[in-house]
């Protein structure tokens, strides 16, 4: 089992709490927006592989309670997990107004040869910021 699968499994079983009190968390939608493939970098640096990525443009997942959604690429989850968890907890406005929708983020997976960009947004606002 890959370490990222273990991390994703752990995240699915972890309950977010504030001082031991479980609170409502936002539902967060994750949408695969676009993939860029760097054929020149693949040719120069990567050993041939048969299968690289199962994600398809337009695919969507819903994170409930900040957990890794079933079927989401574990490597992509590693990249977006802090943003999904923050949005689920009612925190947003990353980097002082980076996104037009302050309760969203655009994150790419960490595959340097064929990164996928994901739009992450709150779809059900149950939490409020506790700052």
Task: List where the protein language model places each region.
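N-terminal, intrinsically disordered charge-dense segments
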Residues: 17-18
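A short beta-strand micro-motif
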Residues: 27-35
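Short, charged beta-turn/beta-strand-edge "cap" motif at the junction between a beta-strand
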Residues: 36-37, 65-71
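Short, flexible N-terminal segments of the mature chain
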Residues: 43-68
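Short, compositionally biased
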Residues: 69-91
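Short, compact, well-ordered microdomains
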Residues: 84-131
């Amino acid at each position: 089992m890959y370490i990222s699968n273990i991390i994703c499994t752990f995240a699915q079983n972890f309950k977010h709490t504030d001082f031991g009190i479980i609170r409502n968390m936002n539902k967060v939608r994750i949408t695969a927006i676009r993939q860029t493939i760097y054929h020149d970098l693949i040719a120069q640096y990567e050993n041939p592989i048969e299968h690289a990525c199962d994600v398809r443009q337009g695919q969507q997942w819903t994170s409930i309670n900040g957990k890794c959604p079933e079927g989401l690429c574990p490597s992509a989850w590693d990249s977006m997990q802090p943003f999904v968890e923050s949005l689920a907890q009612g925190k947003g406005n990353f980097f002082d107004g980076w996104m037009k929708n302050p309760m969203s983020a655009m994150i790419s997976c960490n595959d340097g040869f064929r990164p996928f960009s994901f739009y992450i947004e709150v779809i059900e606002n149950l939490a409020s910021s506790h700052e």
